[in-house]
């Protein structure tokens, strides 16, 4: 419970996504006063829900792993852990114009795209990557050179390069090897913790329910939330107080705080925070972001039966096919099957200006090409979400290019997802980031 004390530090948390909520949670739990500012009318950011057809579910695809210990701890705190559903999933590959299952060792050995030696090189690369712990060294090597070295040129060109292009576009050539290492580590996390096999899960009701319970929990412990409030300026006065100016309900308002924690993307920090040093501004400006254009479909029938289908054939406008219907019980979607069709692009890509109708036509044509049994009359609803700043591009030596969490001005902290260097971007990793940094913020704020 928060400490009722007039002298307790007053914090403004910029951003009501999962990172901002988790930061507010830890500040509140140590007795600080917290106000969250969120420009949207709902909390959650990339984890927020929306309505598609007659179903309310996650705007972007998310899944919980058994090995996601930080997320599972939060769900226990919110009393949602008993409402988890766990399933085993299947993985597919679309290669050489056909769907292939790679959900077991036997299926991997039968995979026709690679010969036995290439499969050995691929398997050895993944196994070797799972044993590595020194991600700092991998940061100084390009992902292409590392994968070519361990998997060989032919395996790289048949498997790794198409997957990297789907996820990163041509930017994969500037990406460090710790990027793929982090994915391998997440794949093997369950085995390292003693589990025989990874399980995928979700909370009944999706992130709409998680966020509702999280917001209620924070409010009941004294955290204030300013939703639908666009922060326009953050300044520090001579008395070292921080002043947050924001627009809400058509009016300009200001609140004052002892400290500010910015959990928003780097371009947004640059836009609204005054007084950043030249070094801080340069580092924030050099952060490149990947965004996503993600089309959701509610179908009357399932597609291929794989949770994720990776695409290695050229010329497909998708990063992959995510069939949430393979995980969710039918009653969660009113008997429908939810499919996500994401496409990751750089934040300045023209895809963000493309009309939704054009995107939908391309997605439907792609499904017709991949799944001969698919018919357009099976689509109950279709709509597209776009986010320009999803993941910072992990370039060579990326960890040394970031801003420190503690800014040069006392009381200002820069804690956004661009700080993640040794993990993939997911909710559990965001929570882990907060756990690793919150103590330093506390010490710095009381220095």
Show where each model-derived region lies.
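Glycine-rich FAD pyrophosphate-binding loop
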Residues: 28-52
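Short FAD-binding loop at a beta-strand-to-alpha-helix junction that anchors the flavin cofactor
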Residues: 339-340, 404-423, 429-433
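Mid-domain catalytic core of redox enzymes
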Residues: 30, 230-339, 343-353, 357, ...
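Internal hydrophobic alpha-helix adjacent to the cofactor/substrate pocket in enzyme cavities
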Residues: 430-447
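Active-site/ligand-binding neighborhood in enzyme catalytic cores
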Residues: 6, 114, 124-234, 242, ...
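Conserved Rossmann-like nucleotide-cofactor binding loop
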Residues: 19, 42, 267
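Dinucleotide-binding Rossmann-like beta1-alpha1 core, especially the glycine-rich loop
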Residues: 53-135, 162
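N-terminal Rossmann-like FAD-binding beta1-loop-alpha1 element of flavoenzymes
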Residues: 9-36
């Amino acid at each position: 419970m928060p400490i009722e004390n007039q002298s307790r530090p007053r914090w403004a948390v910029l951003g009501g996504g999962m990172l901002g909520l988790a930061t507010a949670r830890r500040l509140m739990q140590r007795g600080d006063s917290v106000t969250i500012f969120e420009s949207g009318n709902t909390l959650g950011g990339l984890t927020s829900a929306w309505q598609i057809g007659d179903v309310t579910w996650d705007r972007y695809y998310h899944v919980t792993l058994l090995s996601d210990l930080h997320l599972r701890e939060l769900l226990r705190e919110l009393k949602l852990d008993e409402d988890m559903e766990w399933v085993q999933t299947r993985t597919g590959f679309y290669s050489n114009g056909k769907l292939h299952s790679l959900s077991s060792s036997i299926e991997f050995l039968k995979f026709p795209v690679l010969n036995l030696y290439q499969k050995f090189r691929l398997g050895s690369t993944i196994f070797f990557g799972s044993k590595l712990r020194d991600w700092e060294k991998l940061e100084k090597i390009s992902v292409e050179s590392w994968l070519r070295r361990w998997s060989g040129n032919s395996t790289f060109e048949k498997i790794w390069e198409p997957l990297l292009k789907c996820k990163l576009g041509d930017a994969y050539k500037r990406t460090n090897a710790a990027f793929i290492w982090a994915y391998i580590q997440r794949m093997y996390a369950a085995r390292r913790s003693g589990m025989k096999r990874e399980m995928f899960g979700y909370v009944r009701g999706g992130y709409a329910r998680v966020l509702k319970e999280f917001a209620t929990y924070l409010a009941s412990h004294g955290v204030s939330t300013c939703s639908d409030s666009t922060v326009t300026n953050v300044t520090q006065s001579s008395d070292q107080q921080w002043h947050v100016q924001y627009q809400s309900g058509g009016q300009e308002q200001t609140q004052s705080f002892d400290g500010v924690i910015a959990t928003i993307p780097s371009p947004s920090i640059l836009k609204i925070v005054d007084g950043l040093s030249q070094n801080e501004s340069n580092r924030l400006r050099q952060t490149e972001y990947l965004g996503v254009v993600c089309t959701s479909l509610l179908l009357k029938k399932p597609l291929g039966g794989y949770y994720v289908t990776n695409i290695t054939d050229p010329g497909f406008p998708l990063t992959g096919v995510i069939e949430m219907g393979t995980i969710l019980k039918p009653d969660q979607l009113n008997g429908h099957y939810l499919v996500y069709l994401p496409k990751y692009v750089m934040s300045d890509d023209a895809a963000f200006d493309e009309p939704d109708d054009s995107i939908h036509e391309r997605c439907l044509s792609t499904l017709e090409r991949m799944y001969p049994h698919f018919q357009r009359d099976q689509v109950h609803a279709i709509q597209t979400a776009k986010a320009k700043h999803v993941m910072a591009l992990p370039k060579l030596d990326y960890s040394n290019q970031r801003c420190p969490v503690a800014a040069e001005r006392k009381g200002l902290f820069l804690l956004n997802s661009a700080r993640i260097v040794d993990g993939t971007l997911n909710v559990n990793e965001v929570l882990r980031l907060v756990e690793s940094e919150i103590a330093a913020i506390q010490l710095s704020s009381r220095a």
